[in-house]
Amino acid sequence: MSVKIAPSILSADFAELGAGVEAISTADYVHFDVMDGCFVPNISIGIPVLQSIRKRTALPIDVHLMIVQPERYVDQFCDAGADLVTCHVEADTPEKIHLALDKIHAKGKKAGVVLKPNTRAEAVLPFLDK
């Protein structure tokens, strides 16, 4: 198994975001954290920033949605340039998370589920077929 490197844009200097993206050009992915202030206490970057980053790099962009009801936004993130979109299993009902994953796949993108640190690993079991 090979190790993949995905530096997070969240650690970049936003005044120099283009240069920050270019500085990680040898990485395997660009990691893009999205926080809504509800699912997690912080608020971060969104779709317009993703669109700008997509213009600056050919690297695959891994979008980590830390938002409530992610199925409302997965189409927009896919259209904005995401190559891989991950949703938290805790962010909605299992049916809605399945819907989000189906929408991501319908856009031809890779999909995944992620867990908060205190969530039991078994919580991903209903999603393994995705």
Regions found by a protein language model. Give the residues of each.
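Generic N-terminal amphipathic, Lys/Arg-enriched alpha-helix
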Residues: 1-7
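Conserved anion-binding
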Residues: 2, 13-16, 56, 73, ...
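Conserved beta-strand positions in the central sheet of alpha/beta enzyme cores
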Residues: 6, 29-31, 62, 84-86, ...
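N-terminal beta1-alpha1 ligand-phosphate binding loop
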Residues: 8-20, 35
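Conserved, mostly hydrophobic/aromatic
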Residues: 17, 24, 32-33, 77
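Alpha-helix termination/capping residues and helix-transition junctions
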Residues: 23-26, 79, 128-130
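Glycine-rich, proline-tolerant flexible connector loops at the mouths of alpha/beta enzymes
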Residues: 30-45, 91
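A short alpha/beta connector and helix-capping loop motif
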Residues: 38-70, 74
